[in-house]
Amino acid sequence: VKPHGALYNKAAKDINIATTIAEAVKEVDASLILFGLANSESGKAAEKAGLNFYNEVFADRTYTDEGQLTPRSEYNAMINTNEEAIDQVLQMISKGTVTSTNGHTIPIQADTICIHGDGEHAVSFAQHINSIILASNIQIVSKA
């Protein structure tokens, strides 16, 4: 289960919203997996509710020093080249870190990777990232 848009972003920062979502998912089916932003309140709420949680990272977004997504209102919020997207994804997968917009290395767990489908570079990013992951002998698996 993945909340979308503003709800996803609010749950990442607000433990009350994250808890409400986690409890609702648990009530429907405790075996469901909750997806949410890595390093967020969503993960804490899922753990407290006893749900499986997948830490989602973004190939097409930059990160703050706090490990959160750079707000879209910032000029440097989006990644716009295949090379940047590939480098970021490989760093998150292989090293468990991401480099913030200020150059700091932030710990991050990558269980699933998001590429915004409405992004200008979505198809290209997906194709190139998939190719590099496979060429790097990184196994893509379903955890379900």
Where are these regions (language model features)?
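Conserved, mostly hydrophobic/aromatic
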Residues: 1, 115
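N-terminal glycine-rich phosphate/adenylate-binding segment common to multiple enzyme folds
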Residues: 2-10
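Catalytic beta/alpha-barrel core
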Residues: 10, 29-38
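Charged helix-capping and loop-helix junction motifs
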Residues: 14-20
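Short, well-ordered coil/turn segments that N-cap beta-strands
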Residues: 30-32, 51, 109-111
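C-terminal domain-boundary segment and adjacent tail
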Residues: 32, 124-144
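Active-site rim beta-loop-alpha module in soluble metabolic enzymes
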Residues: 39-97
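Flexible, glycine/charged-enriched surface loops at secondary-structure junctions
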Residues: 96-107, 137-144
